[in-house]
């Protein structure tokens, strides 16, 4: 299971009471998964963009589209995607990016 906080946030993002922080964590999780697939499974940029766009629409995260372009978002997505295992199903806890990725997720605001 990918980070429990990201998975939990993804489930919580479907409620009206979801905080902005929870939405951002869930969006980072979806985006990092897609970026990981681009790194390890040869997904095209178009396919990655479609995964993220579908997640935004399905989960009603439109309010976070601009934030997704921020340096905080892009850096966190990069760290998280690089900390994932080759299958993009979980974190590689031996990755040098693991601790920085966890810290970046916790720092989302």
Where are these regions (language model features)?
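Bacterial N-terminal signal peptides
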Residues: 1-5
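Sec/Tat signal peptide C-region and signal peptidase I cleavage site
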Residues: 7-13
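Short N-proximal segments of mature Sec-exported proteins
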Residues: 15-67
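Compact alpha-helical subdomains of small soluble proteins
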Residues: 47-109
């Amino acid at each position: 299971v990918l980070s429990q906080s990201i998975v939990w946030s993804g489930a919580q993002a479907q409620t009206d009471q979801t905080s902005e922080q929870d939405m951002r964590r869930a969006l980072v999780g979806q985006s990092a998964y897609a970026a990981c697939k681009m790194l390890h499974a040869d997904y095209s940029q178009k396919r990655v963009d479609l995964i993220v766009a579908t997640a935004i629409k399905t989960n009603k995260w439109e309010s976070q589209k601009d934030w997704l372009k921020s340096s905080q978002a892009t850096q966190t997505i990069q760290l998280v995607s690089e900390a994932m295992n080759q299958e993009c199903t979980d974190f590689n806890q031996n990755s040098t990016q693991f601790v920085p990725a966890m810290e970046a997720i916790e720092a989302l605001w």
